């Protein structure tokens, strides 16, 4: 299956994202969204392996240049690999989930989604952040968590990461989210082969659902990365 035309049109103007190599394109939600921060943090850890495998990377988020600068400074994501759109035009062209559209506006929709309404899997993922997950790698180097063991994601570990992200965003809300109009918009992931064939795609279904395998968000890349 060929990658969607709107996506190919966007990539055509991007240096290093032309056909002839594999490319990973991540459409983030708002830059201040939990999912965007967590996804970027996961990608940063895999940058050397992506480069070794010759896979080009581009992330496209909702926001502005000031927010993108702060987002990259906080997450460590390379600024040159992040584009921002003021409105989710490409998201819509690709048919990505716009989120729950509630009568009270975007904030009402967001709060309902946080409660799991119109956002499947959100509550289970929140719970996983507190309960720990032996299938997931550790996220924090801390004596406090080391008491609970090593080599896996300990109870409250992921919840602590998310709390830190929340504190960062809430302290700079208008930097990360210049407009509240699109706070429910979800993202998606597209992995293209050298000939523009779509190797993998995933469309987010809800909050804290940016991957099919949240315990290892980039597991879909395993067949394509250099060991």
Task: Give names to the regions the model predicted.
Residues 1-23:
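A short beta-strand-turn-helix
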Residues 207-226:
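A short, polar/charged loop-to-alpha-helix boundary motif
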Residues 84-206:
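Thiol/selenol-based redox catalytic cores and closely related redox-interacting motifs
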Residues 39-74, 90:
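Structural microenvironment flanking redox-active thiols in thiol-disulfide oxidoreductases
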Residues 6-9, 79-85:
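Short acidic-hydrophobic, aromatic-tinged amphipathic segments that line or gate anion-handling sites
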Residues 15-50, 56-57:
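Short active-site neighborhood of thiol/selenol oxidoreductases, capturing the structured segment around
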Residues 29, 62, 194:
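Cofactor-binding loop segments of dinucleotide-utilizing enzymes, especially the Rossmann-like FAD-
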Residues 31-34, 65, 206:
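Short acidic, S/G/P-rich loop/turn micro-motifs used as interaction or catalytic elements
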């Amino acid at each position: 299956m060929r990658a969607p035309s709107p996506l190919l049109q966007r990539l055509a103007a991007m240096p290093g994202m032309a056909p002839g190599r594999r490319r990973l394109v991540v459409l983030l939600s708002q830059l201040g969204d939990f999912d965007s921060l967590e996804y970027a943090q996961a990608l940063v850890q895999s940058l050397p392996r992506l480069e070794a495998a010759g896979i080009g990377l581009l992330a496209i988020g909702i926001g502005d240049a000031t927010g993108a600068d702060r987002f990259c400074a906080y997450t460590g994501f390379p600024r040159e690999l992040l584009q921002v759109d003021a409105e989710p035009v490409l998201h819509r062209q690709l048919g990505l989930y716009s989120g729950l559209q509630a009568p009270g506006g975007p904030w009402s929709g967001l709060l309902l989604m946080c409660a799991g309404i119109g956002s499947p899997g959100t509550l289970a993922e929140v719970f996983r952040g507190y309960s720990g997950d032996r299938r997931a790698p550790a996220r924090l180097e801390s004596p406090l968590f080391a008491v609970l063991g090593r080599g896996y994601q300990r109870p409250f570990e992921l919840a602590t990461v998310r709390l830190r992200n929340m504190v960062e965003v809430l302290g700079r809300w208008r930097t990360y989210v210049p407009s509240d109009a699109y706070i429910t918009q979800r993202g998606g992931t597209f992995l293209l082969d050298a000939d523009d064939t779509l190797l993998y795609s995933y469309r987010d279904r809800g909050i804290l659902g940016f991957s099919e395998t949240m315990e290892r968000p980039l597991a879909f890349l395993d067949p394509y990365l250099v060991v």
